């Protein structure tokens, strides 16, 4: 990556730290997840959850959402100023599932936000521990990425639904900071920028006055984040053009959509981290594991290790397949929603099936669903191997971006070819004559045309046995190249 010197590792972003050495990073990430674990244990005590109920992923999600809502200052302020009927701005809650007489029952709980904030701070040595909150946001975002394909949202902003693999982090809240920006896909950033430009077109005052100045700063910052994700000079130059535009309008929207399409082959660098549900950290802390002393990393073996030894349950609807539910959560845990299925299957050690073939709905259960027939199952979150999470997008040879499959944003740093249908992608570029023609466009199209699907990305990188924690012995899987992607 260019400008490597100015980049902080994700762990530093995650923990808000300045430059630290590896040991310090591991310790501060460890401190962050043990704080989440302690908070979860305390909440289980408050709610008098049994061991089984505390391991239920739906309960974990409710508790995580409560603390995120308790710390959402902007929304809290908004709720205070715009009171809506039947919503107490000072309270937060959600469904908690309990086991009664051999059945699962739903109980809606309500807590003071102040109380939740107190418990969270107490679990985090009296600090606000924003990093831990961001971590939970990213876990929810990864779960959404695995569960939903944002086709409707893409069409709404004038993008192509086939670009769904660029949409990582599209449900992350704005307040997720640098760690959140690192995991957002190219499509997500493009969509945020297009929404902003459209508002500017419809609302004359959007860029004007004191507020408009702040808007402009936000616009340029988002442009810079997106620029930093691109790995070729031409794409970056085009981003400069979008950023410097006096009065962003349709020409900029066209340029951004062009750039998003180009990212299907000249892929952006998007960070991946394994963020696990709070109950997993809670279980580990409860069993006496000292995260801060041992250190922890979101991109190495640690999350795999943790999942090897954690038993997490999930509620299952009558016609859902428990194995498919497990796959969904496994993908969410490793931020692998857009990974090549061959790679995921190899690491997991069981076949990972395409999203469309899963007979399972989302993890959360709607409040109007009948609990009578709902059962629970153990989620199978273990893996056969582990691999390092990547932030590069798969272009190991820096000089020219290597090819990318239409539906892949690599998660694991594992050698593979990135098969893609060049014809399909290039078809998206013909017949689009609006927008500016520029040397940059010509250059980008030329690079895309010269990309070869058989090029190998992540040369020499492999997966590792779970006993190989120092990653000394890479096993490079060989995929037969015509396998499903």
UniProtKB/Swiss-Prot annotation:
GO molecular function, one term: RNA binding
Family from the record: Belongs to the influenza viruses nucleoprotein family.
Residue ranges of the TM segments: none
Gene behind this protein: NP
Motif (Bipartite nuclear localization signal): 198-216
Protein name as annotated: Nucleoprotein
Pfam families xref list: Flu_NP
Role, per record: Encapsidates the negative strand viral RNA, protecting it from nucleases. The encapsidated genomic RNA is termed the ribonucleoprotein (RNP) and serves as template for transcription and replication. The RNP needs to be localized in the host nucleus to start an infectious cycle, but is too large to diffuse through the nuclear pore complex. NP comprises at least 2 nuclear localization signals that are responsible for the active RNP import into the nucleus through cellular importin alpha/beta pathway.
